[in-house]
Design a protein with these regions (language model features):
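Conserved HGGG/HGGXW glycine-rich cap/lid loop of the alpha/beta-hydrolase fold
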Residues: 1-41
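Active-site loop/oxyanion-hole signature of alpha/beta-hydrolase fold enzymes
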Residues: 32-66
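Gly/Ala-rich beta-loop-alpha elbow adjacent to hydrolase catalytic centers
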Residues: 69-77
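Flexible "cap/lid" loop of the alpha/beta hydrolase fold
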Residues: 78, 89-117, 167-170
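Active-site nucleophile elbow and catalytic-triad environment of alpha/beta-hydrolase enzymes
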Residues: 128-145, 167-168
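Short beta-strand/loop motif that positions the catalytic acidic residue
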Residues: 148, 154-156
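Conserved loop-alpha-helix segment in the C-terminal half of the alpha/beta-hydrolase fold
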Residues: 156-189
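Catalytic histidine-centered segment of alpha/beta-hydrolase-like enzymes
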Residues: 189-198
């Protein structure tokens, strides 16, 4: 089987992709799930600097691979796309929302995240997650401004409504910065679209792969 690497979001689990993975298998692809640093199977991965994060990413995913990335994992894949040089990059509901929507500061975000991890006794290293959040968010660069040179499919949820409107407006404002990016909203989905509608998400991915890779075996 061919392979896609799947970079998780914060709080995502391997179990969450089970139906998505089955649908991917139907198209001849296996999915290798990767927890972000500080989380679950990668709880002991320490990130102290941007270089640590780049080295971790490079050790997990070979250059030129097919990559799917969700939420915080999407922010990682987008920011460090030049190190991945992905053959095909699929972004699931990430790389587009900044603090201007959430109306909070980086410090507030980190405090809330650490409290959530502690209160729910999650198998995470709160300090590593906090550092990861700081690295990605202190000087946030969205998908339209990182200079993507990789064929990229951005799949976005359309709920809740106020986030949907934010996304549509951001796309409209950045219509001149969309080289290499194809965008599709998944109807009647919220953030974890691959959990809610695994078949529809996978079908959208492979429709796109067929259109953009019609002369290759993707």
């Amino acid at each position: 089987m061919k392979k896609f690497y799947f970079i998780s979001g914060l709080g995502s689990t391997k179990e969450s992709i089970q139906y998505f993975e089955k649908e991917m298998n139907q198209f001849g692809y296996e999915v290798q799930y990767i927890d972000i640093p500080g989380q679950y199977t990668n709880q002991d991965v320490k990130i102290q600097s941007e270089q640590d994060l780049i080295e971790w990413l490079s050790s997990e995913i070979p250059v030129g691979s097919n990559v799917i990335a969700f939420s915080m994992g999407a922010d990682i894949a987008i920011r460090y796309h030049s190190y991945l040089q992905a053959r095909n990059l699929i972004i699931l509901d990430g790389g587009i929302i900044d603090y201007d929507l959430m109306n909070i500061t980086l410090e507030e975000d980190i405090t809330m995240t650490k409290s959530y991890i502690k209160e729910n006794q999650l198998d995470m290293n709160a300090e590593t997650i906090a550092k990861l959040t700081s690295l990605l968010r202190e000087q946030y660069i969205d998908i339209f401004h990182v200079g993507l040179d990789t064929k990229t499919l951005l799949l976005l949820s359309d709920h809740p409504d106020f986030v949907y409107e934010y996304k549509k407006n951001k796309i409209k404002v950045n219509c001149d910065n969309m080289d290499h990016i194809d965008i599709q909203f998944m109807k009647d989905t919220s953030h974890e679209m691959y959990v809610e509608k695994p078949r529809e998400v996978v079908e959208s991915i492979f429709d796109w792969l067929q259109r953009t890779n019609h002369k290759s075996n993707y």
